[in-house]
Amino acid sequence: MVIDKSIPKATAKRLSLYYRIFKRFYADQVEKASSKQIADAMGIDSATVRRDFSYFGELGRRGFGYDVTKLMNFFADLLNDHSTTHVILVGCGNIGRALLHYRFHDRNKMQIVMGFDTDDNPMVGTKTPDDIPIYGISTIKEHLDNSGIETAILTVPSIYAQEVADQLIEAGIRGILSFAPLHLQVPKGVIVQSVDLTSELQTLLYFMNQNHLD
């Protein structure tokens, strides 16, 4: 199957949602799903579904729908969800602690295996109820050496985000999910996905206000 390398970011952001939908269809014993069924489950239009899928070659036949098992496995491969991905978390504040307690592995094959914070944080040297060890940030390279871990969640205050990101990259991290509301400068080959909760909330309020005006 030929995959178009120039997939738009909007399409890429929907990949995990498609995967989730096909897993739900599979659990409900749905064998075939039309683009309309997929679109309705996603809250988008069927033309968007067909356009998204066109970037991945022939995923289904017009008039026959999409094979649920085939597409579920396709997106699992695409998202590397057949094997567990180990992730570290840096920043054990309120957001960090919430994420440490979130059971990613119950829903997808992702698992936080280590947490890091400033060396003087009382959590350093302890473990979470799920047995995740918390280490001092000064030992991050030591703990990542030969670990094979390339993904990190960054939940430190904004003023430290770039400095910590630099440390992560030096330690071998290639992908960062950042909760800091600023643009991180990273070298080519390192991917940053940003989550700005304030911006998302402001966007929600904007649309609520526009809906009220209508």
UniProtKB/Swiss-Prot annotation:
GO terms for molecular function: DNA binding; DNA-binding transcription factor activity. Keywords: Cytoplasm, DNA-binding, NAD, Repressor, Transcription, Transcription regulation. It holds the Pfam family Put_DNA-bind_N. NAD(+) binds at G91, C92, G93, N94, I95, G96. GO terms for biological process: negative regulation of DNA-templated transcription; response to redox state. GO terms for cellular component: cytoplasm. InterPro entries: CoA-bd, NAD(P)-bd_dom_sf, Rex_DNA-bd_C_dom, Tscrpt_rep_Rex, WH-like_DNA-bd_sf, WH_DNA-bd_sf. Residues 17-56 bind DNA. It is found in: Cytoplasm. Gene3D superfamilies: NAD(P)-binding Rossmann-like Domain, Winged helix-like DNA-binding domain superfamily/Winged helix DNA-binding domain. Modulates transcription in response to changes in cellular NADH/NAD(+) redox state. NCBIfam families: PRK05472.1-1, PRK05472.1-3, PRK05472.1-5, PRK05472.2-3, PRK05472.2-4, PRK05472.2-5. Belongs to the transcriptional regulatory Rex family. Homodimer. HAMAP family: Rex (MF_01131). This is Redox-sensing transcriptional repressor Rex. It comes from Streptococcus equi subsp. equi (strain 4047).
